[in-house]
């Protein structure tokens, strides 16, 4: 099975960016790592320079690496764990963008 990732695009609520970053790093992402099938995570923030002048819809991206042959089951575990997670009203949860992606081409580096 190809390597699989879940991408979560999100924004902090206005005036809550420091709390948002602290909550993600110290609470939410460690909770996600406890879910069977979630192997690793990385967080990204938009760089100050973009490819064009188009306004980006989300400032932050989380990439969760999934280590499972049953992706739907892992996603079900994530949703099932949600009620017990220590959620905090610091993110615009109503406008999250979620996607599941799989590797098509392994990393190729210039030599």
Residue ranges and their predicted role:
Residues 1-111:
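Macromolecular interaction modules
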């Amino acid at each position: 099975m190809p390597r699989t990732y879940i991408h979560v695009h999100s924004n902090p609520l206005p005036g809550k960016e420091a709390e948002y970053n602290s909550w993600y790093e110290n609470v939410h992402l460690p909770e996600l790592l406890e879910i069977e099938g979630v192997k690793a995570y990385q967080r990204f923030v938009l760089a100050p320079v973009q490819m064009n002048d188009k306004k980006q819809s989300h400032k932050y991206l989380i990439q969760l690496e999934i280590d499972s042959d049953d992706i739907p089951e892992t996603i079900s575990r994530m949703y099932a764990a949600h009620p017990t997670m220590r959620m905090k009203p610091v993110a615009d949860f109503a406008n999250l963008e979620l996607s599941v992606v799989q590797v098509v081409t392994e990393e190729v580096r210039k030599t």
